Structure formats: structure tokens, C-alpha cells
């Protein structure tokens, strides 16, 4: 899958789930399941409920997302 195929959106973490998975409320009020990208995991970036994040969605499954950035 090429990087150009992803859809980037802003969202907010609602709750933490097991295995580094989170419920994310997108700016268009949809709720998706998001997991941390590998680079965020590698650099021990912590995410907690209420954080603003940027997620990448694929056009194939719009219910799952990859968290790629946490806003300060």
C-alpha cells in the first residue's frame, strides 16, 4: 500500500484499550479504533485520554486508523 492512499484526519482520544489500541473521536464525530504507529512506539510516546492526535485511515477500512502524531 502506497503512502498516498491514506486519509489524514484530526481526532481526540476517548479511551485506552488493551494492546496499545485507543478509541478516537474524529473531527467529523465518527469513532474509530486506532493503534500507535511503529515510530511512536519506538520512541515511547505516551498517549492518554483527551490528547489531540493525527490519524491515518485507509480507504479500505474506515473503522480502523493508525495514530501518527500526538499534538502537544
Swiss-Prot record:
Pfam families the record matches:
eIF-1a
Q: Which family does it belong to?
A: Belongs to the IF-1 family.
Which portions of this protein are annotated as coiled-coil regions? none
Origin species, per record, is Neisseria gonorrhoeae (strain ATCC 700825 / FA 1090)
Name the HAMAP family on file: IF_1
Q: Which NCBIfam families match?
A: infA
Q: Name one GO molecular function term.
A: rRNA binding
Q: Which part of the chain is the S1-like domain?
A: 1-72
Q: How does it assemble?
A: Component of the 30S ribosomal translation pre-initiation complex which assembles on the 30S ribosome in the order IF-2 and IF-3, IF-1 and N-formylmethionyl-tRNA(fMet); mRNA recruitment can occur at any time during PIC assembly.
Which InterPro entries does its entry note?
NA-bd_OB-fold, RNA-binding_domain_S1_IF1, TIF_IF1
Q: Where is the signal peptide?
A: none
The record's subcellular location field reads: Cytoplasm
Q: This chain belongs to which protein, by name?
A: Translation initiation factor IF-1
What PANTHER family does the record point to? TRANSLATION INITIATION FACTOR IF-1, CHLOROPLASTIC
What this protein is reported to do is described as: One of the essential components for the initiation of protein synthesis. Stabilizes the binding of IF-2 and IF-3 on the 30S subunit to which N-formylmethionyl-tRNA(fMet) subsequently binds. Helps modulate mRNA selection, yielding the 30S pre-initiation complex (PIC). Upon addition of the 50S ribosomal subunit IF-1, IF-2 and IF-3 are released leaving the mature 70S translation initiation complex.
Listed GO CC annotations: cytosol
Amino acid at each position: 500500500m502506497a503512502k498516498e492512499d491514506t486519509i489524514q484526519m484530526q481526532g481526540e482520544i476517548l479511551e485506552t484499550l488493551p494492546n496499545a489500541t485507543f478509541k478516537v473521536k474524529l473531527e467529523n464525530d465518527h469513532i474509530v479504533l486506532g493503534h500507535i504507529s511503529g515510530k511512536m512506539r519506538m520512541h515511547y510516546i505516551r498517549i492518554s485520554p483527551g490528547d489531540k492526535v493525527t490519524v491515518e485511515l485507509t480507504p479500505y477500512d474506515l473503522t480502523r486508523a493508525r495514530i501518527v502524531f500526538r499534538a502537544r
